[in-house]
Curated annotation (Swiss-Prot):
GO terms for molecular function: rRNA (uridine-C5-)-methyltransferase activity. Belongs to the class I-like SAM-binding methyltransferase superfamily. RNA M5U methyltransferase family. Pfam families: TRAM (PF01938), tRNA_U5-meth_tr (PF05958). The lineage of its organism: Bacteria, Bacillati, Bacillota, Bacilli, Lactobacillales. This is Uncharacterized RNA methyltransferase LJ_1698.
Amino acid sequence: MQKNQIVDLEITDLSYEAMGVAHLDGMTVFVNNALPGEIVSAKLLKVKKNFAFAKIEKIKKESPDRINVKLRQWVQTGLASLAHIKYDKQLEFKRNQVVNLLHKADLDNVKVGQTMPSPEETGYRNKAQVPVREVNGKLDIGFFRKHSHDLVPLTSFFTTDPEIDRVLIKVRDILRKNHVPAYDEIHNKGEVRYLEVRRSKATGEIMVILVCLHKDFPQLKEVTKEISEIKGVTSVVLNHNPKKTNVILGKKDYLLWGEPQITDKIGDVSFKISPQSFFQINSLQTPRLYDLAIQKADLKPDDVVIDAYSGIGTIGLSVAKHVKAVRGMEVIEPAVEDANANAKLNGITNAEYVVGKAEEVMPRWAKEGLKTDVIFVDPPRKGLTPEFIDAAVETNPKKIVYISCNPATMVRDLQLFKEQGYDFDEIDPVDMFPQTPHVEAVAVLERTEK
């Protein structure tokens, strides 16, 4: 097998990145956008010792689970890499990811629930971050082609709230009209690197964030004025990112016009969201995710709960009405200020948040005599540190509720908890990100009586 060779392949499976998997001459071949059951003629793009990557030239036998995608670019860019698969099969694929991870970890006895579908299959995202680059001599927005930094221009982002799409295009046109130079990442020059737009499903408020190389540029005043006149926009912010880096946001935000925050809701709890706040992307699915976690935790009115990695308090403040007290911690100081302000905003008096690392704060609270019944944790994709796991176990809660955006690190962490006397018998997948391979999951660990 060699590069550029055309081969016929029978697709037998999907990889965790949703690439078609085939086998030929003892090698595994990953085929972009191919589905199990399909027979394809494919061109080999990269050939390694034990595996190869290929792209479809022709589908000879099509899967009944394939659907036609209006814009090929949605799949090409990875913006919606499952858009060609029927939604019920996407849910099945996500459940299988969890089943396979448990199987590899010799945990076949753990029950995996059916993936909870999202109320919206498209247009569900309450936030978009899109790169701004020059394409064919003019400023454009879109998404990078998979595994590259080539911008594919787009006018519709499919998974994003259509109101956000409308604002993105209007802002693009304002930047063009005012001859604002797009960022050039090779030479680290130009002005606007990214556009970020956040919209509250609850209030309709829209925040526009210009991520810029410089904190001022000649057209900024006029651009701000024109953006502020777009219907629905309540905030215009400049985020200053002067570094030559792939990191999207810089550390400093400047309010150019309007309100410093927008307000959204999870269930009946309101949250003020700042430009850099972490807030779950799928507004309609988030309350269902939290309700599932609360139900599985079987909380009691006398419970004391720790909300670790608390962000702006979304989980803890959603839990507060079910329990006696919520204590939370987070390393990002502005997020802690927002969490305490959000408690006040909702008249929640039994929740408080502090700045600090969970692995340092939890043992301190335990020494001070705090008896914790339940820990809720929703870590970043890399999962929990061994130090956190040790500190959580030392805190000796009856239960640990683990909400994960990466089942691979979740299964790893659950095994570490298991070794330290906490057991679990079920994982429930939740679809927070339809049209993408990402899967959220919930598990409840219970202390086994030693």
